[in-house]
Amino acid sequence: FCKAWLMDHGAENAFIDEAKNVIYEYNAENDVPVAIFMAHIDTVFPESVPLELTEKDGKWFCPAVGDDTANVALLMLMAAYVANEKPKTNGGIVFVMNSCEEGLGNLKGSRALNARYGKRIEQVISFDGYLDGIVGMAVGSLRYKVTVKTAGGHSFADFGNVNAIERLSAIITE
């Protein structure tokens, strides 16, 4: 949807990369420095959760509308404006509706952008959430995969043996 909408609104070179990011590059050819503006298109909700939009007193309500659908819509409008007005810029602008930001996505979309643009990136501005503030620093994420194997498990058949769930719970509380 995002790619088709961008193309219908003047951003003919919009594309989807291998990480499922929707990208529109403006004056970003060759090795020019770029500023990346992004908002994420994934949500924490599984596909089985209905995302029903309702309106009350002039406000929209829907799971994920604040994280991050509203920002995606604004970013798409900004990209369309730039595509049509063609402002003069000192470097490239990259508009990204990035994927795999939430949950198990492990920032796959952001990491793909870093791999694609690398040292050309002068700044990254991510529109995320709906709070009344600005975070002016990089935000990091560390992910760990922990495997715990024990002899115990079932509360009846393995009674008295160490239980993996209990051990994981102890790690979390520490």
Segments (PLM) and residue ranges:
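Short, glycine/charged-enriched secondary-structure capping and boundary segments
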Residues: 29-30, 50-53, 108-112, 138-141, ...
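Histidine-centered active-site/metal-ligand motif
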Residues: 40, 154-156
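Acidic-glycine-rich active-site phosphate/pyrophosphate-binding loop
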Residues: 42-55, 121, 136-147
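Acidic/His- and Gly-rich active-site-bordering loop/insert found
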Residues: 1-61, 81-84
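Acidic-enriched catalytic cores of C-N bond-cleaving enzymes acting on peptides and small amides
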Residues: 156-174
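Buried hydrophobic positions in well-ordered alpha/beta secondary-structure cores of metabolic enzymes
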Residues: 6, 24, 37-40, 75, ...
